[in-house]
UniProtKB/Swiss-Prot annotation:
Its main location: cytoplasm. Keywords: ATP-binding, Cytoplasm, Endoplasmic reticulum, Golgi apparatus, Hydrolase, Metal-binding, Nucleotide-binding, Transport, Zinc. The lineage of its organism: Eukaryota, Fungi, Dikarya, Ascomycota, Saccharomycotina. Its EC number is 3.6.-.-. Pfam families: ArsA_ATPase (PF02374). InterPro entries: Anion-transp_ATPase-like_dom (IPR025723), ATPase_ArsA/GET3 (IPR016300), ATPase_ArsA/GET3_euk (IPR027542), P-loop_NTPase (IPR027417). It is found in: Cytoplasm; Endoplasmic reticulum; Golgi apparatus. One of its GO terms (molecular function) is metal ion binding. One of its GO terms (cellular component) is GET complex. One of its GO terms (biological process) is tail-anchored membrane protein insertion into ER membrane. This is ATPase GET3. ATP binds at residues 26-33, 240, 267.
């Protein structure tokens, strides 16, 4: 007899093996709220462990969701001892790369002059997919710090990802980089001496060593991302045709990358049949539409954890509101017993 997946994320929230959790889907479906909710519930369920929530979306929303400012360095969420947040800023990361390159290069060569003028940042800033590449570099830096015992040690990292297209490019990077580095290694092996002479003459750049080290790091991430005990992807959608269609496309892509995906959060549900006091014709009509697509989700993903989350009367912002909302990831929302909670959110300034 097949086991039926529970309609909650209790198993993931209490997981002791997952290092990487990605949360993603179509734009505007509640990805940030969902990633914040997962992070909060995991931190509450496992108080002795440390969790890090990273935004890889250029339109950062973590600061807005929690009502406090986060930046490129991890910082604890006020009121949570074991949950930190950070927002990767591609433009700041490019400036850091440029400044680092200036410091490492000979001040008398022409390449250094180019960098002094912000040449690297200007050159790379317009490359398609640079945001995803920089996000991936942050992952690699994080793994390296963990292995070397530097900084805060995090047991699980949760990613609040960009809309689907950006996320897929991000997840393709380990495979793409691995192939690229293989080719680059072959070229560097043949033309290494010539490349050294072109980069300033006096410096003996260990190109092959750098490439091999980068390849090893990329391969390590590939192995972790495709290990279902270490990495999983939580899809977020709303109960409408376009969102369902994009979720199916995302799941098929994730499976082609051999990445584990077995959870879907369906946001903004009205549950109008059980809310007679606040029901209206428009609410009932939309709920009837939502039920149609919920049935399709149930048929398509009968072996997934499908979590049905309510549409709240107010904004889900601030730690207290996020705690109230996130409890329904752990315990299914009951439209009758839990009805009052969605009308009792604190108003945020």
């Amino acid at each position: 007899m097949d086991l039926i997946a529970e309609p909650n994320l209790k198993e993931l929230i209490n997981s002791t093996t997952h290092k990487w959790i990605f949360v993603g889907g179509k734009g505007g479906v509640g990805k940030t709220t969902s990633s914040c909710s997962i992070s909060i519930q995991m931190a509450l369920a496992q108080p002795k462990k440390q969790f890090l929530l990273i935004s890889t979306d250029p339109a950062h929303n973590l600061s807005d969701a929690f009502g406090e400012k986060f930046g490129k360095d991890a910082r604890k969420v006020t009121g949570m001892d074991n949950l930190s947040c950070m927002e990767i800023d591609p433009s700041a990361a490019l400036k850091d790369m440029n400044d680092m390159s200036v410091a490492q290069n000979d001040k008398n060569d022409g390449f250094s002059d180019l960098l002094q003028g912000g040449g690297l940042a200007e050159l790379t800033g317009s490359i398609p997919g640079i945001d995803e590449a920089l996000s991936f570099m942050e992952v690699m830096k994080h793994i390296k710090r963990q292995e070397e015992g530097e900084g805060e040690k995090y047991d699980t990292v949760i990613f609040d990802t960009a809309p689907t297209g950006h996320t897929l490019r991000f997840l393709q990077l380990p495979q793409t980089l691995s192939q690229l580095l293989q080719k680059f290694g072959e070229i560097a092996g043949r033309f290494g001496p010539m490349l050294n002479s072109l980069t300033g003459g006096g410096q003996n750049m260990d190109i092959m060593g750098k490439v091999d080290e980068l390849k090893a790091n990329v391969e390590k991430i590939r192995e972790q991302f495709t290990n279902p005990d270490m990495t999983t992807f939580v899809c977020v959608c709303i109960s409408e045709f376009l969102s369902l269609y994009e979720t199916e496309r995302l799941i098929q892509e994730l499976m082609s990358y051999e990445m584990d995906v077995n959870s879907i959060i369906v946001n903004q549900l009205l549950f109008a049949d059980d809310d007679a006091e606040h029901n209206c014709r428009r609410c009932q009509a939309r709920w009837n539409m939502q039920k149609k697509y919920l049935d399709q989700i149930g048929e398509l993903y009968d072996d997934f954890h499908v979590v049905k989350m309510p549409l709240c009367a107010g904004e889900i912002r601030g730690l207290n509101n996020l705690k109230k909302f996130s409890q329904f990831l752990n315990k299914e929302y009951d439209p009758v017993a839990d009805n009052k909670i969605i009308y009792e959110l604190e108003e945020q300034k």
